[in-house]
């Protein structure tokens, strides 16, 4: 049997900033998603952020980030709508406060858990210049002035 000990696995990750929305704080937004995921096993996270459709299709995990918290989740499915839309099963999987939202990007997430900045430093920014400047995703989140969507990889 051939061994593949030398080969490495690489996963792609997208970081999505969680921000205040209308009357909801970033923490409220996170909590609503955590509650729904706990109830039904998965949750929709929708965004109109400028996600790159081609990159987003390759993403295995998502980081939900703010200055106050960082979480990681598995991507169960990713759906892109050219025209902002609500998926048919949004009522089943989106937090109630967002189940009528129309958005371009809908990611169905599972296994959402907190992740430390130290553990995040085992991920590398795809942008080599930013990676060289911050030396890890955790350092970037902690020290950058403004969080935006970014992509990272982890090799193991």
Where are each of the predicted segments found?
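Residue-level detector of functional hotspots within protein domains
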Residues: 48, 59-61, 93-98
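Compositionally biased, charged N-terminal/linker segments
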Residues: 1-58, 65, 122-156
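Short, hydrophobic/aromatic-rich beta-strand segments within well-structured domains
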Residues: 58-65, 74, 108
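Aromatic- and Lys/Arg-enriched surface recognition patch
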Residues: 70-156
